Regions:
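A cross-kingdom feature marking solvent-exposed beta-strand/loop segments within repeated
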Residues: 74-82
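Short, small/hydrophobic-residue-rich motifs at membrane-helix boundaries and re-entrant hairpins
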Residues: 19-39, 47-73, 93-153, 160-169
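Interfacial aromatic "cap" segments that immediately flank transmembrane helices
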Residues: 2-31, 82-107, 154, 171-225, ...
Length: 264
């Protein structure tokens, strides 16, 4: 199956299972209502309660994402029915996997940041503190800082930022396949087996996988744009966007990711 066929299949998947899709959409409806309540009633206690319930709902939705992929791996064209307990457990596993995959580049970036930017930033702080001892005029302090030092600081920060961006993109690409691996094996350890995930992407075809990601990104951008426009409708916009657009997008992405995974 080529990438375009995968996209067509994933796009038609919710429409071919309208009843089950709408059941899943109820979760998004609940989340949308909670968001609207938080906006309409600015009460600290209500915000906390709504926040906790919303997090639980989002975890269950993540579990639904896993169940859709699992159903796809079984060569089923049906959207699975909700199973709150199973979905909640799967959602927690999903969350743990995602946190770890994005924690790795964060730690690497922080480790790199200290030797690359540490000395320059410390030097800048020392110079600034010395200048501040003589004047409280912010403009004079900024103008007195050597331009070469400012350039060195910005260049070092820029290098770290570019490196971090590349790392996050790489681990983002890995995490998509890792989530599919989690759905396939129901094992977080298997999902964290990065060498296996890399081999899986290679078996899919790096070019094919990147092409797939680009198309999913573009489609998701359109979904976000439509969702944003609908959300601008007073009082009911967020609820409608959550119920229809966001639920459709999640089902689409889950199906598409499972199908590209099966290509490897």
């Amino acid at each position: 199956m080529d990438v375009i066929e995968i996209m067509r299949d994933a796009m038609s998947y919710p429409l071919a299972n309208v009843k089950n899709w709408l059941v899943i959409a109820l979760l998004f409806l609940i989340n949308g209502i909670l968001q609207q309540l938080a906006i309409n009633y600015r009460n600290a206690y209500l915000t906390v309660i709504v926040g906790v319930i919303s997090v639980i709902v989002l975890i269950v939705i993540s579990g639904v994402f896993i169940s859709i992929m699992r159903e796809t791996f079984d060569n089923s064209s049906e959207i699975p029915m909700l199973n709150p307990i199973v979905n909640l457990v799967d959602g927690i596993k999903y969350l743990i996997t995602q946190i770890i995959y994005y924690l790795i580049p964060t730690v690497i970036t922080l480790i790199l940041a200290f030797p690359v930017t540490g000395s320059k930033v410390n030097q800048l702080l020392m110079v600034t503190s010395q200048l501040a001892a003589n004047t409280t005029n912010t403009t004079q302090i900024v103008n007195a800082i050597p331009q070469s030092l400012l350039i060195d600081v910005f260049v070092s920060i820029g290098i770290v930022a570019i490196f971090a961006l590349i790392l996050y993109i790489i681990f983002g690409l890995l995490s998509n396949i890792a989530i599919a691996r989690l759905a396939e094996t129901d094992d977080i350890t298997a999902a964290l087996n990065i060498p296996y995930i890399i081999k899986k992407i290679q078996s899919i075809g790096i070019g094919k996988y990147v092409y797939f990601i680009v198309l999913v990104f573009l489609v998701s951008f359109v979904f976000s744009l439509v969702s944003g426009l609908i959300s601008a409708i007073p009082y009911v916009g967020i609820i409608i966007a959550s119920f229809i657009v966001q639920s459709f997008a999640i089902v689409f992405i889950a199906r598409a990711t499972a199908l590209i995974y099966m290509e490897g």
